């Protein structure tokens, strides 16, 4: 053990007294975890990352979900209102000749 620490700038050699070379070897014998895909994806597939911020994208999605029901309800009310009420725009009854004196 002293040969291993010989050239190191250490003041107290007892700092390394608990070091055991056997423990280092045991840790390196474990196999690393490997990702195994469960689906086959085409090799031509191109992965593109979105440039928008993740938080902003999430907030927009939540806002769309929240307001989708309101928007649908409003459209239904408008459709029902159009069938029973007269149209909002009314055809002009005055002729264009009346405004020529200006």
Curated annotation (Swiss-Prot):
Gene: DDA1
Annotated keywords: Acetylation, Phosphoprotein, Ubl conjugation pathway
Organism encoding this protein: Homo sapiens (Human)
Keyword 4Fe-4S: no
InterPro entries from the UniProt entry: DDA1-like, DDA1_dom
Modified residues annotated as N-acetylalanine in this record: 2
Annotated family: Belongs to the DDA1 family.
Residues making up the signal peptide according to the UniProt record: none
Pathway: Protein modification; protein ubiquitination
GO terms under biological process: positive regulation of proteasomal ubiquitin-dependent protein catabolic process; protein polyubiquitination
Its biological purpose: Functions as a component of numerous distinct DCX (DDB1-CUL4-X-box) E3 ubiquitin-protein ligase complexes which mediate the ubiquitination and subsequent proteasomal degradation of target proteins. In the DCX complexes, acts as a scaffolding subunit required to stabilize the complex.
Subunit structure: Component of numerous DCX (DDB1-CUL4-X-box) E3 ubiquitin-protein ligase complexes which consist of a core of DDB1, cullin-4 (CUL4A or CUL4B), DDA1 and RBX1. Component of the DCX(DCAF15) complex, also named CLR4(DCAF15) complex, composed of DCAF15, DDB1, cullin-4 (CUL4A or CUL4B), DDA1 and RBX1. Part of the DDD core complex containing DET1, DDA1 and DDB1; the DDD core complex recruits a specific UBE2E enzyme, such as UBE2E1, UBE2E2 UBE2E3, to form specific DDD-E2 complexes.
Name by which UniProt lists this protein: DET1- and DDB1-associated protein 1
């Amino acid at each position: 053990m002293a040969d291993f620490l010989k050239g190191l700038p250490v003041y107290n050699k007892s700092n390394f007294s608990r070091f055991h070379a056997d423990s280092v070897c045991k840790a390196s014998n474990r196999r690393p975890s490997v990702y195994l895909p469960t689906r086959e994806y085409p090799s031509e597939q191109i992965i593109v990352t979105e440039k928008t911020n993740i938080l902003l994208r999430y907030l927009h999605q939540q806002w769309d979900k929240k307001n989708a029901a309101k928007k649908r309800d409003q459209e239904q009310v408008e459709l029902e209102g159009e069938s029973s009420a007269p149209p909002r725009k009314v055809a002009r009854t005055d002729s264009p000749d009346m405004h020529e004196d200006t």
